[in-house]
UniProtKB/Swiss-Prot annotation:
Function field: The beta subunit is responsible for the synthesis of L-tryptophan from indole and L-serine.
Species of provenance: Pseudomonas putida
Keyword Transmembrane helix: no
EC number from the UniProt entry: 4.2.1.20
Cofactor(s) needed for function: pyridoxal 5'-phosphate
Protein name: Tryptophan synthase beta chain
CDD domains cross-referenced by the UniProt entry: Trp-synth_B (cd06446)
Matching InterPro entries: Trp_synth_b_CS (IPR006653), Trp_synth_beta (IPR006654), Trp_synth_beta/beta-like (IPR023026), TrpB-like_PALP (IPR001926), TrpB-like_PALP_sf (IPR036052)
Top-level EC class as recorded in UniProt: lyase
One GO cellular component term: cytoplasm
Sorted UniProt keywords: Amino-acid biosynthesis, Aromatic amino acid biosynthesis, Lyase, Pyridoxal phosphate, Tryptophan biosynthesis
Reactions that this protein is recorded to catalyse: (1S,2R)-1-C-(indol-3-yl)glycerol 3-phosphate + L-serine = D-glyceraldehyde 3-phosphate + L-tryptophan + H2O
Amino acid sequence: MTQSQYRPGPDANGLFGSFGGRYVAETLMPLVLDLAREYEAAKADPKFLEELAYFQRDYIGRPNPLYFAERLTEHCGGAKIFFKREELNHTGAHKVNNCIGQVLLAKRMGKKRLIAETGAGMHGVATATVAARFGLPCVIYMGATDIERQQANVFRMKLLGAEIVPVTAGTGTLKDAMNEALRDWVTNVEDTFYLIGTVAGPHPYPAMVRDFQSIIGKETRAQLQEKEGRLPDSLVACVGGGSNAMGLFHEFLEEPSVQIIGVEAGGHGVHTDKHAASLNGGVPGVLHGNRTYLLQDEDGQITDAHSISAGLDYPGIGPEHAYLHEVKRVEYVSITDDEALDAFHATCRLEGIIPALESSHALAEAIKRAPKLPKDHLMVVCLSGRGDKDMQTVMNHMAAQEKQA
């Protein structure tokens, strides 16, 4: 396994193999080129890195723990399961790792206004949080469907001073919110910084977001070394756009002994038209500035994604994931809504931790695999966020089940 094979970049054009790139309107091209230049300069600037480390430690609360899930391990009766506790970060998810990095870059570039898209609302909350901390006005684009199912996060964003713009186009979900945010950016290129929440979008976003999230994997390596004296045997993380997964995976891509599993949202099943599994049920195409795997119909039109989890409800996936899928370094599987809900309840009851429905997809895959593995197998699951935001969804689901019973 060589560096050039699994951690190739991206190259100067933002490509991971044939995926990624910069498919943007002419008006945006100077902006993304400028952003790439500024990001490269920031990465090489010790002052920027020092400031980033300060906020990671004192504002986000890093490092967060790598926790041995003893009762879940006993319940499964196989592999030793560890949780990387991203839900303990300030704002309750991994999203803030990226937001703090990007807001420091926006500040460095002299931008006066932040915009962002959000699905589950966690990236919106994290963006509104850093906007408040740095005194910047902030506009969040959110699909009307997602606003409906994520009322608590909408209120949190408003409390933090953000303006929320409901998007009714299409299915009123993340894809549509991202379209609107891109339109805003084209119109306000001079003073506005677009804070993309996942490893998608035009170059340099996929690489930049991955880099800001890669602290997850770096901490995991050091923490497991301290606890067990060795590398993990497997890593499991949920994948929508895929930033928590890339954050965990990137550190280990060149370690051939580490098996890496990305978990897509299988919705009602990948054999139906109600899922969000782009790699297991999609084909390559271009969306939101990059070439990747997408859910599309025979005419190449983007089809609607479905997942019980608003954060995985996206018809594409980050281009680096598409590349890692094609070169077979990472195995991508899917978990249904029902399997994710079962894992959600099991984690609540066994560990006293209420996980996000997104993270519950990764937990479900871990629960499936662990019993078949030896007791000395070390498995790390990324607990990407907490489940407070999902209470209404779970309550509705339980009420519907009781009616059927």
